[in-house]
């Protein structure tokens, strides 16, 4: 059976949180605790909603946006998943996608394509859910795996493809999520060492 791999970018293959917090912390002159981990998706234990919005706009324009370090060794990632088409999915404004692709290429990931999809919609950019994007890319009788750090994206894919291999990458902000079928990865090794029949 043919097989494809779909990976979220920020928080799964690139260390978005650390990069964003460093840039925004410097921008607002915040004293961010060492090894800070956000307690929720919107960093509300550190930032006001207005700071998140302003900081996000600043981050998008910064050079740091396209210099985010990897969360998994790209060489090892390529060795394990390089036999399959790899598609990266990111929920950023579509006009930033080219810069994100450059970032992924620069750190050494090999991939077939990168796309914008997810549950956050940006003004003037009608978006797709992850499941809709996957449906567009799959060919007949193909299996796939999907990895994301947001429970809602994992649920979206699982509900539309109940036989797919869906993983939630553990982060501080998703610790309360439990699901009988969606797998939780504590570390990349959980995904890399999982046996698959493809």
Feature names for model-found ranges:
Residues 145-186:
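Acidic, Mg2+-coordinating phosphoryl-transfer loop and its flanking beta/alpha structural elements
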Residues 94-144, 154-158:
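Substrate-recognition "cap/lid" segment bordering the active-site pocket of phosphatases
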Residues 45-61, 111-115:
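Short, basic/glycine-rich phosphate-binding loops at helix/coil junctions
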Residues 131-139, 189-198:
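Short amphipathic alpha-helix with an adjacent loop that forms part of the alpha/beta core around
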Residues 1-54:
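Active-site neighborhood of HAD-like aspartate-dependent phosphohydrolases
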Residues 114-115, 181-191:
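Short acidic-hydrophobic, aromatic-tinged amphipathic segments that line or gate anion-handling sites
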Residues 57-88, 92-101:
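Short, acidic loop-to-helix structural element flanking the phosphoryl-transfer center
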Residues 122-127, 175-182, 196:
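Short, charged, surface-exposed secondary-structure boundary motifs
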